[in-house]
Amino acid sequence: MIKIGDIELSSNVILAPMSDITDLEFRKLVKRFGAGLVVSEMIASRAMVVKSRQSMQKCAIVHDDPTSACVQLAGCEPNVIAEAAKMNEDMGAKIIDLNFGCPAKKVVGGYAGSALMRDEQLAAKIFEATVKAVKIPITVKMRMGWDDNTKNAPDLAKIAESSGVQMVTVHGRTRCQFYSGNADWDFIRSVKEAVKIPVIANGDITNFAKAKEALQKSGADGIMVGRGAYGKPWLVSQIAHYLKTGEEKPAPSIAEQLDIVTEHYNAILDYYGESVGVPIARKHIGWYSSGLPSSAEFRGAVNLMNDPAEVKEKIAEFYTSVMKE
């Protein structure tokens, strides 16, 4: 089983950090189904240091479970990232993950995210400063490299390991690929062979077969599920069960899904308040219903609603109609 410092994961399947997706309520839901680890959405270190309202909300954690208390930080200033890491440690975080993989223009434009893979000296300073600043484990998530000519993830993983970083996750694409093409799980094997710390494979892991193939091709210690979990908070635990037993556990029934969607919707409203929560919930409701009969009409109707009670009534009506078909 994977250990990050003294923290042992219950499975080798992890929920990826995803901006505007893996907030506290979604992480709690995925963890309850049985994820080995859940990671917060990316938080800008400088915003964290000045205690912006949004950053403080993003770093909220479940305090009684170390595997629900992993916070991901982004930035390019070693001292600022280190300070943000210490702040999160003081607030109860048990693991800090460093973002070296985000391909978004607004992130790399500030020389953060995957742009850090172009400057190994700066990367080393960030690793060293953050490891030194806290007592909790530091992990890092990266891509294969910036482009096809600079696939330096194995070298960067070595630098991370020598600096005291305790786990590396690799998305099997370069920054310049964004999300086009297919994740190169074979390449991740070169990272696994370069270091002794746990290596996690990420990218395109959306079902049982792909999870098994990603592990076999990469030789990684575990896998990280990202976009495949949209509208399927149970997928991470399903994959973990499959990898352990070979059994393909079915998704929750439609009746069970109604309960899950309703619970998640209520949790979002409680956490954010109705005025903010209703718009946030729409994307999740859309993903939950995707592929079900008449889901396009349902999503269109929900997207026009602002009354929380009306939305909840529409959710119940839709899932009840699906159960009758």
From Swiss-Prot:
Source organism (scientific name): Rickettsia felis (strain ATCC VR-1525 / URRWXCal2) (Rickettsia azadi)
Active site: C102
Species lineage: Bacteria, Pseudomonadati, Pseudomonadota, Alphaproteobacteria, Rickettsiales
Name of encoding gene: dus
Keyword Secreted (UniProt): no
Keywords noted in UniProt: Flavoprotein, FMN, NADP, Oxidoreductase, RNA-binding, tRNA processing, tRNA-binding
Family of the protein in this entry: Belongs to the Dus family.
Disulfide-linked positions: none
Keyword NADP (UniProt): yes
Main function: Catalyzes the synthesis of 5,6-dihydrouridine (D), a modified base found in the D-loop of most tRNAs, via the reduction of the C5-C6 double bond in target uridines.
Protein name: Probable tRNA-dihydrouridine synthase
